[in-house]
Amino acid sequence: MKLYKKINKADLIDYLQSVKDTNSLHYGKNPIIPGNFLLFILEEMYQEFYSMPLSYLKANFCSPAYLNERFCFIFNQNAFQITDRNQTLILKGEWKQ
């Protein structure tokens, strides 16, 4: 499965407030998107296509993700990765039902 998503400032602020994130890297002119936010979005996408909940997830973070970037979420029932528009690997990992 391959899906694309651009994360806007409103989505980021909503997430940061909901988890009470105060990390200065996640705010400002060119904020870094928290890795857990990317994993949250990825899991929501997974749940849209597969009926079984996840019981295990392992992720390796490779590069920072920046606001207003268009991300490519690629996943199947066993593995996932997220890249930016330049195909820079942001994170990759595996999961199990």
Can you describe what each PLM-predicted range is?
Residues 1, 64-97:
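HotDog/MaoC-like acyl-thioester-processing domains
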Residues 56-64:
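Short alpha-helix capping/helix-loop boundary micro-motifs
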Residues 1-55:
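Hot-dog-fold acyl-thioester-processing enzymes
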